A protein has these predicted regions:
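Substrate-binding surface in catalytic domains of secreted glycosidases
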Residues: 72-81, 127, 150-271
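Boundary regions of SH3-family modules and the immediately adjacent low-complexity/disordered segments
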Residues: 3-36
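Hydrophobic faces of well-ordered beta-strands that scaffold small-molecule active sites
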Residues: 37-41, 59-64, 99-103, 141-143, ...
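N-terminal catalytic cores of secreted or lumenal carbohydrate-active enzymes
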Residues: 63, 68, 72-82, 89
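Active-site beta-loop-alpha junctions enriched in small/polar residues
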Residues: 40-44, 67, 104-106, 146-148, ...
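Catalytic domains of carbohydrate-active enzymes, especially glycoside hydrolases
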Residues: 45-72, 128-141
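Substrate-binding cleft of extracellular glycoside hydrolase catalytic domains
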Residues: 81-141, 145-146
Length: 272
């Protein structure tokens, strides 16, 4: 049983009455057959979803950046779908693509921490996510919560554990973005990758940046050796199921400059 504040407990079997088991109707899942080939579609303004026509070669899932947490919003979610976003969803479905919309925490440490540590706020956020999935006929949700307190690791797990069955009962997919295993407390050590991989349908390794914009030395964005070493850690010390691991690669690089003993960089995107 679960109390009103989210704590779990039990009741002795002797104190239970007659138990009736009800078999739910099977719900068709929104998972993809075979390997996941996903493309994030980034846009920030309301109703600014890109117009698309025809299929995307090699892609079977799109993840538009539709949702983000409100700062100090107590579990509320901002959306930027609009008519353009609805047309985008219809285009994707008409071309056989799954839509796993992304929700971001905008790297807001304190806002995220407040929600994760409050059962009522977590439940409010979960209800908002579920309502948006239904409202826009989405096939799943991609959780992109970055820059979190390491101390909130267990409560982030709790959030996912509470969200997953709500999506699963509708046949919807839960995916979670995570960083490389080795790094800072708020960037890397805030994720329990083993538990996340058990709860979510897919865990997405954001294989970037090996050397980011704030680095004090120049280097590659995602070197092959670095990526392979981290995949080995995911499958080894982190205990992630390989069937659930999705590798996200950067379609950008950095041009580095050095002047007066200091380095700076410029981001260069991959062009069509």
């Amino acid at each position: 049983i679960r109390t009103s504040n989210g704590s779990l407990g039990y009741v002795k079997e002797d104190n239970l009455g007659k138990i009736n088991t009800i078999r739910d109707d099977m719900v068709e899942t929104s998972k993809v057959e075979g390997k996941v080939s996903l493309a994030w579609e980034y846009f920030s303004d309301y109703g600014s979803a890109p117009e698309r026509s025809g299929a995307m070669d090699g892609v079977n899932v799109v993840s538009p950046t539709f949702f983000r947490l409100e700062q100090l919003g107590k579990g509320n979610v901002k959306e930027n779908v609009g008519t353009a976003g609805i047309n985008y969803i219809n285009w994707a479905h008409n071309n056989g693509l799954k839509v796993w919309a992304m929700i971001s925490n905008e790297s807001m440490l304190d806002t995220t921490s407040e929600i994760m540590n409050d059962y009522k706020l977590r439940n409010k956020l979960i209800n908002n996510i579920v309502n948006l999935v239904v409202k826009y006929n989405l096939d799943g949700i991609n959780i992109d919560f970055e820059n979190m307190y390491m101390e909130d690791k267990a409560m982030f797990n709790r959030f996912l554990i509470e969200l997953e069955p709500r999506l699963n009962e509708m046949g919807k997919v839960l995916t979670v973005d995570v960083t490389a295993p080795d790094g800072s407390e708020t960037w890397s050590m805030c994720f329990d990758r083993n538990t996340i991989s058990k709860v979510a349908d897919y865990i997405i390794f954001m294989a970037y940046d090996q050397y980011g914009a704030s680095s004090n030395k120049e280097g590659t964005t995602a070197g092959c050796d670095w990526v392979e070493a981290n995949i080995t850690k995911f499958l080894g010390q982190e205990g992630v199921n390989p069937d659930k691991l999705v590798l996200a690669v950067p379609f950008y690089t950095r041009l580095w400059k050095e002047a007066n003993g200091k380095v700076s960089s410029e981001t260069v995107d991959l062009k069509d």
